[in-house]
Curated annotation (Swiss-Prot):
Pfam families: Chitin_bind_1
UniProt entry keywords in alphabetical sequence: Antimicrobial, Chitin-binding, Disulfide bond, Fungicide, Signal
Signal peptide: 1-20
Protein name: Morintide mO2
Length: 79
């Protein structure tokens, strides 16, 4: 009986994990609600694990890996 209970609990957790992927390419390119970031694995969150482009963020990403803008040019003299 204990083995059956354990197996049932394990399968329930497995199904819950599989259906928890709710954004990005794993979920028809859906975006997260409330401006949360979508991780590379299809989960919504607000920490760097979800939001960093370097970590594979899919949508609503912040920072992490952009090349940055070029600096302004030096002032030119008259010809």
């Amino acid at each position: 009986m204990a083995k059956l209970s354990f197996l049932s609990l394990f399968l329930l957790c497995l199904v819950a994990t599989a259906t928890a992927q709710n954004c990005g390419r794993q979920a028809g390119n859906r975006a997260c609600a409330n401006g949360l970031c979508c991780s590379q694995y299809g989960f919504c969150g607000s920490t760097s694990e979800y939001c960093s482009r370097a970590n594979g963020c899919q949508s609503n990403c912040r920072g992490g890996g952009g090349a940055g803008g070029a600096g302004g040019g030096a002032g030119g003299g008259s010809p």
